[in-house]
Curated annotation (Swiss-Prot):
GO terms for cellular component: cell periphery; cytoplasm. SUPFAM superfamilies: SMR domain-like. The lineage of its organism: Eukaryota, Fungi, Dikarya, Ascomycota, Saccharomycotina. This is Endonuclease NBR9. Residues 194-215 have a biased composition (Low complexity). The keyword Transcription does not apply.
Amino acid sequence: MKGTGGVVVGTQNPVRDYNHSTDEEYQRLRRLADEAYKKRDQLSHESQTAYQQGDKKLAHELSEKSKAQLKTAEDFNMQAAEYVFVENNADSSSNEIDLHGLYVKEALFILQKRIKFAIDHNEPQLNVIVGKGLHSQNGIAKLKPSIEEFCAKHGIRNHLEKGNSGVLVLELQGVQMQMDGPAVNAPTNQYNAQPHPQYNNNGGQPQGQAQNYNNSGNDNKDSTLTSIFKIFCNCIQSLA
């Protein structure tokens, strides 16, 4: 049986043929997010111009519209993250997690929760599918080095799966992660930047200085990514 993304599920040896880089729905959601960021930037620029010209009322109106576009962009990115995560993990075994198609902050946020789950359930290893960076800008992988850095920070030994440089094997025996405060914050409105991030081309590593409008959406984003993780937990528990 195939999932909507072309993943064969329900077999003993599932075939991995889902590719987010050619998935029209995934690309549509990321593209809509990118377009909303561009609108946000334009409205922000117009707001600043109006303010400098002394029209504070117009500046405020444009600023509010800019904030609305920011929320729209973030919503589309969260939809894309949920969509690609579910598609990629439809055929994942209970000791692996596929982070293809997630931006770095999305991936790290979900990964830290998955590691905590593994530790709590005495799982000795976790296979993290990160890919080889073939779809990243200039073919430079972003997920793998970011996850290796995360592991180094938390004392998690890791190595590449033999014969597969797109899979990091995390050794979790004896690992104790302090999770009282999040090791990785949920993606917030600071995942974007001024100028707007070219998400479709750089794998979700925005460059530049973030413009911080407000933090009112942080809890919603935390909740959304937690929900994505819970979907994954349900999948692996069904395999147990």
